[in-house]
């Protein structure tokens, strides 16, 4: 049992996080389901979820760091870049604000039943976005994103606070409805995910730091490492898939997982 809990579990959870992070299917929801099914929910797995999310977030940062630097630096085109900074800030503020205020309530929702409901609702949202998106994209680069679009994306992104809804699912779906080219919606979604997930992970870690000790550090580090490696090696391939595959496919996948939760 020691081998299973301390070695196999962090590897599996790291793989789950590393794969599902890049699709609009809720990586958090998948981890909640897996941990509940194996009946292994405890202080260690709670901390492990934080570490594996940090692993995939760092891989996203490394993949997008050139685009992030272009947004954050203020060279000759100062006004333009400041504008981009504001866009990113506006897109993350609603979720940060509500996440801080309702932190304890949000954490109380972390169970398979709530994940099932969120998977279904999020699935419908993805299918609706695919069906009713503008025939021709109106926003073809991150530079073209305006403040109103950023605010709308930020508001809809708060749906991810309900476990299982999917942050990328909410942001990509609403961006698609707003007329974003798919690659722009995907890139912007992942760029604004970095400060959100990093901030949420740090907050979770601070609130649970008492559960980190010398005995579980190897366990946590192995989950972090697996998540980072899987994410880093596959991110380019996964984003290519996400740019090409219909959102309806992911909506149907979410329905299937919700059905499995219901019947099992």
UniProtKB/Swiss-Prot annotation:
Membrane topology: Multi-pass membrane protein
Main location: membrane
Protein localization: Cell membrane
Keywords assigned: Antibiotic resistance, Cell membrane, Cell shape, Cell wall biogenesis/degradation, Hydrolase, Membrane, Peptidoglycan synthesis, Transmembrane, Transmembrane helix
One annotated GO molecular function: undecaprenyl-diphosphatase activity
Cited Pfam families: BacA
Any single Gene Ontology cellular-component annotation: plasma membrane
Role of this protein: Catalyzes the dephosphorylation of undecaprenyl diphosphate (UPP). Confers resistance to bacitracin.
Entry's family note: Belongs to the UppP family.
Other remarks in the entry: Bacitracin is thought to be involved in the inhibition of peptidoglycan synthesis by sequestering undecaprenyl diphosphate, thereby reducing the pool of lipid carrier available.
The protein's name in its UniProt record: Undecaprenyl-diphosphatase
UniProt organism field: Buchnera aphidicola subsp. Schizaphis graminum (strain Sg)
Gene: uppP
């Amino acid at each position: 049992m020691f081998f299973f809990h301390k070695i196999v579990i962090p590897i599996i959870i790291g793989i789950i996080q590393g794969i599902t992070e890049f699709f609009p299917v809720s990586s958090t929801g998948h981890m909640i389901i897996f941990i509940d099914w194996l009946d292994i929910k405890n202080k260690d797995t709670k901390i492990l979820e934080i570490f594996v999310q940090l692993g995939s977030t760092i891989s996203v940062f490394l993949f997008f760091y050139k685009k992030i630097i272009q947004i954050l630096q203020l060279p000759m085109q100062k006004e333009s870049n400041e504008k981009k900074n504001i866009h990113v800030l506006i897109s993350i503020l609603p979720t940060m604000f509500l996440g801080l205020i309702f932190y304890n309530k949000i954490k109380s929702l972390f169970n398979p039943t709530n994940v099932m409901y969120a998977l279904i609702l999020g699935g419908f949202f993805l299918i609706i976005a695919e069906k009713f998106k503008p025939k021709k994209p109106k926003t073809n680069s991150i530079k073209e994103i305006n403040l109103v679009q950023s605010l709308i994306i930020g508001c809809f992104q708060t749906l991810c606070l309900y476990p299982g809804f999917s942050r990328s699912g909410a942001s990509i779906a609403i961006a698609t409805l707003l007329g974003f080219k798919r690659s722009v919606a995907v890139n912007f979604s992942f760029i604004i995910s970095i400060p959100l997930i990093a901030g949420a992970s740090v907050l979770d870690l601070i609130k649970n730091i008492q559960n980190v000790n010398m005995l579980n550090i190897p366990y946590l580090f192995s989950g972090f490492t697996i998540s980072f490696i899987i994410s880093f090696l596959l991110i380019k391939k996964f984003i290519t898939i996400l740019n090409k595959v219909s959102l309806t496919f992911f909506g149907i996948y979410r329905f299937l997982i919700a059905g499995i939760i219901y019947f099992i």
